[in-house]
């Protein structure tokens, strides 16, 4: 957990240091994402996968595409006034 707070601190500091130059700095903080790493961890055991998904308020694991979409949005002009934020892409886990 300390490393995650470190990323948030670095993100905020870098955002403030670079804002005047028009450089935006943000972080994406993914939750449990269904990737090959999860597959290796669960060894194909659907029970383990279900247990991981049950810990998410939305009741499922996220997808790599959902994390990528958040990152693309942060890089887009639509997020032009967003800087210094750590965007959770975690199905509501941090809101608990």
Predicted regions, residues:
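A glycine/serine/threonine-rich, flexible loop-to-helix segment
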Residues: 20, 32-55
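Active-site helix of classical SDR
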Residues: 3, 11
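A short hydrophobic alpha-helix cap/turn motif
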Residues: 18-21, 33, 62, 75
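Short, small/polar-rich loop/turn modules that mediate ligand/substrate recognition or access, typified
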Residues: 19, 24, 82-84
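Proline-glycine-enriched beta-turn/loop adjacent to the NAD(P) cofactor-binding site
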Residues: 26, 30-31, 35-36, 85, ...
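C-terminal helical subdomain
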Residues: 27, 50-82, 91
């Amino acid at each position: 957990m300390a490393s995650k707070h470190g990323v948030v601190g670095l993100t905020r500091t870098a955002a403030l240091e670079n804002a005047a130059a028009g450089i935006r700095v943000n972080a994406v903080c993914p939750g449990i994402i269904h990737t090959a790493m999860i597959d290796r961890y669960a060894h194909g055991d659907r029970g383990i996968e279900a247990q991981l998904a049950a810990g998410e308020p939305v009741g499922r694991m996220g997808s790599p595409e959902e994390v990528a979409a958040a990152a693309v949005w942060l890089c887009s002009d639509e997020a032009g006034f967003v800087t210094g934020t750590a965007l959770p892409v975690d199905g509501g886990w941090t809101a608990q």
